[in-house]
């Protein structure tokens, strides 16, 4: 007897599989542990409660394979098969779960589905007779129990199914539309039983064999260099198999964020704390190495740069090489500028002087150390950038408040301590009076450069219409952040 696998239990299985894949998709990693993600009980409650949103979108997309039944009688033999069998109506089941040391157990209750399609039959006695009609299958009270666990293979997440049982409280199959009732009578009863058997008995093995294999192939093929916008990428690698308890499932990972094809080798600095008394749906520990990789690659690729020129009206007078007796301009401090470049302007080109870095402290908060080179050129910079006049260095020490915005962790600039010094000069000695007179321009531009670094942010994985809730919080500890994340469905 040849038969194909189908039925509403496969659809429930696909829901559970989608939820498990969604769970694992929150895990990013690379080489050395720099990130820990803990999925707490409220996380699974949320996605179990809102799983119908995923199901309602995904179930109608499922292609239902053919069901085929050979049959025979004393006068001949034949075969009947389904055609264009698809989902006409679907009622989402209720999904519950329980965490354990071995993984997670999911079960569904309720739920109903109606399948509609066509059947085609042929029967051979002396000649071959063909007939066709319609088929409806109604399944209600669908119950499925399944255990699943996640593990890593080559640093990528994988899913394995443990126990799986299915029970359908009621399943009815209707066959009609034939003009040869005697032919239908030959196969109706065994064909209906086969449809029921396929739906009721084969769902788990099909899910284990087909769905899980496909899911694991997909998960294993996920890129380890993930675009998160503006040519920044997350590199990730699962360092070990997940750890499960009755309260949470936890993933240890290593991750970095880099620009383009830059490389970074983050290290685990400090020890993670326990989750707070109100951990939220998801708790994540983020090493200072991750944002430091981000700004390291930004420095390597010269992304932090600002040009202050005469095109900015508020600073144009100060950038002149010539000005009156009572005027204040850069030329007043440098005789060489007045004599060799009269009636011109100087451009100030700001860029990172050395690799910036973050420091995180439970007592002091988040601090960003960044030194900016300020190169002086005769305007326009685009034509004279090979002839640098002088270089200043502006050292900034900024306190930063981390905050959550949409699906990213950003930093808000609080206070900055800014000092300027001379690196070299080709236009004579640079007097302290010049540094004092131009401190406002240097400070204003340096703060803008700091804000540009903080604006990139660290991405938090999200899914479809699931967003961060206002109850989400972030805390600072010695050399890492701890984020307690709640989600909401919009």
Curated annotation (Swiss-Prot):
It comes from the Eukaryota. Keywords: Disulfide bond, Glycoprotein, Signal. Disulfide bonds join 164-204. GO terms for cellular component: extracellular space. Glycans are attached at residues 32, 145, 271, 369, 405, 415, 465. Residues 1-29 form the signal peptide. One of its GO terms (molecular function) is lipid binding. The keyword Transcription regulation does not apply. Belongs to the BPI/LBP/Plunc superfamily. BPI/LBP family. This is Uncharacterized protein T19C3.5.
């Amino acid at each position: 007897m040849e038969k194909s696998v189908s039925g509403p239990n496969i659809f429930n299985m696909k829901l559970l599989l989608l939820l498990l894949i969604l769970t694992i998709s929150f895990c990013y990693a690379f080489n050395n542990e720099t990130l820990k993600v803990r999925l707490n009980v409220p996380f699974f409650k949320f996605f179990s409660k809102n799983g119908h949103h995923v199901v309602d979108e995904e179930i109608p997309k499922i292609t239902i394979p053919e069901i085929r039944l050979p049959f025979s009688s004393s006068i001949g033999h034949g075969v009947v098969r389904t055609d264009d069998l698809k989902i006409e109506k679907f009622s989402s089941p209720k999904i519950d779960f329980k965490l354990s040391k071995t993984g997670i157990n999911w079960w569904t209750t309720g739920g109903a589905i109606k399948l509609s399609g066509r059947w085609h039959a042929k029967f051979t006695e002396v000649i071959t007779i063909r007939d066709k009609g319609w088929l409806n299958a109604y399944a209600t009270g669908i119950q499925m129990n399944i255990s699943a666990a996640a593990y890593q293979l080559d640093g990528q997440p994988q899913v394995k199914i443990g126990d799986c049982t299915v029970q359908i409280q009621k399943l009815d199959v209707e066959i009609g539309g034939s003009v040869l009732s005697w032919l239908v009578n030959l196969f109706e009863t065994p064909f209906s039983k086969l449809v029921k058997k396929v739906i009721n008995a084969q769902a788990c093995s099909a899910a284990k064999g087909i769905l899980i294999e496909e899911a694991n192939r997909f998960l294993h093929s996920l890129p380890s260099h993930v675009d998160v916008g503006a040519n920044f990428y997350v590199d990730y690698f699962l360092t070990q198999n997940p750890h499960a308890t009755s309260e949470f499932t936890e993933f240890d990972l290593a991750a970095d964020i880099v620009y383009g094809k830059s490389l970074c080798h983050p290290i685990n600095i400090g020890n993670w704390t326990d989750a707070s008394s109100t951990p939220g749906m998801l708790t994540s520990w983020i090493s200072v190495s991750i944002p430091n990789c981000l700004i390291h690659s930004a420095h390597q690729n010269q992304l932090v740069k600002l040009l202050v020129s005469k095109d900015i009206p508020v600073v144009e007078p100060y950038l002149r090489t010539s000005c009156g007796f009572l005027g204040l301009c850069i030329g007043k401090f440098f005789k060489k500028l007045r004599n060799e470049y009269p009636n011109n302007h100087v451009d100030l080109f700001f860029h990172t002087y050395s690799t910036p870095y973050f420091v995180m402290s439970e007592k002091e908060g988040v601090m960003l150390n960044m030194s900016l080179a300020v190169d002086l050129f005769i305007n326009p910079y685009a034509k004279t950038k090979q002839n640098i006049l002088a270089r200043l260095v502006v050292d900034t020490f900024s306190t930063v408040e981390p905050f959550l915005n949409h699906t990213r962790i950003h930093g808000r600039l609080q206070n900055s301590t800014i000092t300027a010094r001379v690196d070299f000069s080709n236009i004579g000695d640079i007097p302290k009076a010049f540094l004092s007179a131009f401190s406002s321009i240097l400070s204003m531009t340096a703060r803008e450069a700091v804000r540009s670094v903080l604006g990139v942010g660290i991405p938090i994985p999200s899914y479809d219409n699931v967003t961060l809730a206002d109850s989400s919080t972030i805390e600072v500890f010695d050399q890492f952040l701890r984020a307690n994340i709640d989600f909401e469905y919009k």
